[in-house]
Amino acid sequence: MTATLERRQTASLWERFCSWITSTENRLYIGWFGVLMIPTLLTATSVFIIGFIAAPPVDIDGIREPGFRSLLYGNNIITGAIVPTSNAIGIHFYPIWEAASLDEWLYNGGPYELIVLHFFIGICAYMGREWELSYRLGMRPWIAVAFSAPVAAATAVFIIYPIGQGSFSDGMPLGISGTFNFMLVFQAEHNILMHPFHMMGVAGVFGGSLFSAMHGSLVTSSLIRERTENESANNGYKFGQEYETYNIVAAHGYFGRLIFQYASFNNSRSLHFFLALWPVVCICVTALGVSTMAFNLNGFNFNQSVVDSQGRVINTWADILNRANLGIEVMHERNAHNFPLDLASEVSLPVALNKVEING
């Protein structure tokens, strides 16, 4: 009998690293997309926290009137924000080494670009990581497809809109009150409430919430008891069990009698596909709407569009909305320009009809 001894093959450091990166046995899956995601999101998060606490004033309008938005300059959690990059920079790539000094980089709002660009790369890598993990586990790729909707929305707001407007100063400030300010200014300049793509987004968000609540309540109400009536239905499910944990026939029958028969799904796969499809499609359409409004393809304007037989204007809510838009636009960037473009281009109205004479 002959025994053969072979030298044991030892994996190189790179091979062991690759095996660890792509292993699905880790507590948290890393993956090759994770190699890109982790440093970019850590960078964006770290700079955001530091800037939110201690960033110096930023000259957002490029007119030497810096705005104070960090906590150390008297703001709180509500009013604090990372101020967008200065209008003097426009849409130029503005890393630290492009500025003459660190103080100049901070004064021109360089941290905003750093955070936004790293965040954008990070969430794209997170979406790729979702696909990668699904691929390793033999799952279908629809989780990453669903996450593409918020990625598209963030891309539209933080990347496409500033490019279309010609400056990162038009981007959304990274803070609570800054977000609301961005929404008001967006409405004033683009009339987004009258844009059909925004209406689809509203239907997606509220409709998705309604559908999720309906589905969750129906499932919870039709759980299957395991053995006896004395056992709680809440304890009936065991992780990994092969059989259904709720009775879809009962849920279908209940909802069909509550509304009408064809308002409910009798197929679990089509039901859950619809629950995923509805908000994803609507949010993607809204992102497309923001992307078109970035290049000033705005919402409908029905200002003074309803007249009587004599040509006199019949005021509608569209006229009220238009007046509100003008008012918001006048208040916005009040020191950067005297009047909004659509106000300055209007025919001037007489303020006084008769000259007032003063007899002293």
UniProtKB/Swiss-Prot annotation:
Binding site for pheophytin a: Y126
Record-marked site positions (Stabilizes free radical intermediate): H190
Transmembrane segments: 29-46, 118-133, 142-156, 197-218, 274-288
Positions with a binding annotation for a quinone: H215, S264, F265
Binding site for [CaMn4O5] cluster: D170, E189, H332, E333, D342, A344
Cofactor note: The D1/D2 heterodimer binds P680, chlorophylls that are the primary electron donor of PSII, and subsequent electron acceptors. It shares a non-heme iron and each subunit binds pheophytin, quinone, additional chlorophylls, carotenoids and lipids. D1 provides most of the ligands for the Mn4-Ca-O5 cluster of the oxygen-evolving complex (OEC). There is also a Cl(-1) ion associated with D1 and D2, which is required for oxygen evolution. The PSII complex binds additional chlorophylls, carotenoids and specific lipids.
The protein's assembly and partners: PSII is composed of 1 copy each of membrane proteins PsbA, PsbB, PsbC, PsbD, PsbE, PsbF, PsbH, PsbI, PsbJ, PsbK, PsbL, PsbM, PsbT, PsbY, PsbZ, Psb30/Ycf12, at least 3 peripheral proteins of the oxygen-evolving complex and a large number of cofactors. It forms dimeric complexes.
Record's protein name: Photosystem II protein D1
Organism: Galdieria sulphuraria
